[in-house]
Every structure is written in structure tokens, then in C-alpha cells.
């Protein structure tokens, strides 16, 4: 499975087919856990050492951008979701707050996986990437400040639904979105290409596994729906590539309904 994809652990519904990760099922070439494994596009004649231009690909790390889309979309609509909560409507505020909490946990886990599993390995094999990695670490530290502030601001608003309590949440969302606007494209442009000529598929899959284990219990279908809806085609290709047929069936019959029901509660009366 590409880096840091959907984490289904802790949710009993995630057991079918090994959860909504890259299944590596019949007909999918490449290393364990996913298609397009080592050497997917490098081919004969590729030159250069790990991390250098022209080096052969050793893994498929497209999942970084796929998860980034979910994070960007989810936090990006945060202000509108909060604006759709009527003054004092604590029930609706709790639904929106729970959604933002899920996104916060997902981003926490995504960055934790990179901090513990990626940076040292990448720097050791591609020393020329040291400057990029130092910048990523600094950006993660900044994001941690914003996410910690969000985690602290959410409970009061979820309990009251009052605009006075929403103000703190909105401030933290502004900080998160500003930081994401810098960090995500920087990582995709400067780090992911180095990953794809430096890491093995098993190492990329370990990042995915770290993320999978972090999904809060009961949030599997909601997070899967968020990932799918953030993809350019609505997630059709993502499903075909990442989900084995039995899991796609479970999503269509059970998961999609749960996601859509939650989405209806979540959106409520969004104001322009």
C-alpha cells in the first residue's frame, strides 16, 4: 500500500480482506502489499544513485499525495462546517467536532510515521536530501503546535455549540491550513521523488501500516469515505487499486451508507 494510506486497525469492520489498504491481490504486480513495486518505472538504462535524478524507482509512494488530498480537503472545509452550526446547537457541533478530531488524529499519525520511520532512513541513504528533511521536521513541529491547539479548543465548542467557543477552533484551523499550504506541496515535490528512488516497497508499506493502526475505533468507513471523496475521480481508481473485491462490496453495501449518513449530519446547513 502506498505511504500512509487508510488505517483500519481497531475497527472490527476493517477485518474483511485485510482492511481498505493495498491488497496486493491477484494480478497486482510489485512488492508485498501493493502494485508498482520496486523498479516500477525506472527500467533499463536508468542512472544515478538513490535519490538522484535519473535513478531507478524502487517503490511506489503515490499514497502520500492521496492522503494529502484528504487532509487538505478535510481541514479546508472546516470553516464552512463550523459556520453551518447554529448558535448553541451542541449536537451538531459535536458531530463537526468529532470529524475535525478524526482529521487531527489522522494527520498526527501521518506525521508520527514519517518522524519515526522515514527521515533517518532517507537521510542515511540520500545525504543530499538532508536540507529537505530538516525543513520537513521544522514544518512538522509547527504543525504539531497547531494540532495541539485544535485538540485543546474542540471540547468546549463541542459541548456548547456557541460562537464564542468556536472562535478558538477557527483560529487553529487557519493556522493548520496555512501550514498545510506550505508543507504538503513541499513534501510532494522534494521528498516523495527521493522516497521513490531510495526506499523499498516494504518500507513504504510500513508507513502505511503505522497509519492504519491509528484509525480511531468506529471511524473506518468515515475515513475511507473522506479519502475517496478527496480523489480527483471520486475514488473509483483508488478503490480498484487498493481494495480487493470483497472489501469494495462491503463499502458499497455498508460503508458508503454510513459515510453518507454521517456526511448529511456533518454538513447540516452550511452557510456560503
Go through the PLM ranges and name each one.
Residues 1-272:
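Small-residue-biased structural context
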Amino acid at each position: 500500500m502506498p505511504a500512509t494510506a487508510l488505517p483500519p486497525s481497531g475497527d472490527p469492520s476493517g477485518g474483511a480482506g485485510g482492511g481498505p489498504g493495498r491488497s496486493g491481490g491477484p494480478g497486482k504486480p510489485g512488492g508485498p502489499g501493493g502494485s508498482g513495486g520496486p523498479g516500477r518505472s525506472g527500467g533499463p538504462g536508468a542512472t544515478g544513485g538513490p535519490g538522484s535524478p535519473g535513478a531507478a524507482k524502487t517503490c511506489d509512494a503515490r499514497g502520500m499525495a492521496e492522503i494529502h488530498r484528504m487532509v487538505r480537503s478535510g481541514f479546508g472545509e472546516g470553516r464552512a462546517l463550523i459556520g453551518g452550526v447554529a448558535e448553541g446547537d451542541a449536537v451538531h457541533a459535536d458531530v463537526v467536532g468529532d470529524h475535525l478530531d478524526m482529521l487531527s488524529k489522522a494527520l498526527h499519525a501521518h506525521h508520527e510515521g514519517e518522524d519515526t520511520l522515514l527521515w533517518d532512513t532517507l537521510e542515511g541513504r540520500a545525504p543530499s536530501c538532508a536540507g529537505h528533511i530538516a525543513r520537513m521536521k521544522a514544518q512538522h513541529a509547527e504543525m504539531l503546535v497547531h494540532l495541539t491547539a485544535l485538540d485543546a479548543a474542540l471540547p468546549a465548542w463541542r459541548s456548547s455549540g456557541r460562537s464564542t467557543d468556536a472562535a478558538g477552533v477557527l483560529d487553529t484551523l487557519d493556522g493548520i491550513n496555512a501550514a498545510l499550504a506550505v508543507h504538503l506541496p513541499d513534501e510532494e515535490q522534494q521528498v516523495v521523488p527521493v522516497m521513490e528512488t531510495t526506499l523499498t516497497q516494504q518500507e513504504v508499506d510500513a508507513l502505511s501500516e503505522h497509519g492504519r493502526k491509528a484509525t480511531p475505533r468506529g471511524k473506518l468507513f468515515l475515513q475511507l469515505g473522506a479519502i475517496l471523496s478527496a480523489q480527483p475521480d471520486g475514488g473509483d481508481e483508488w478503490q480498484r487499486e487498493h481494495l480487493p473485491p470483497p472489501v469494495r462490496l462491503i463499502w458499497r453495501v455498508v460503508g458508503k451508507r454510513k459515510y453518507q449518513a454521517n456526511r448529511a449530519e456533518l454538513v447540516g446547513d452550511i452557510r456560503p
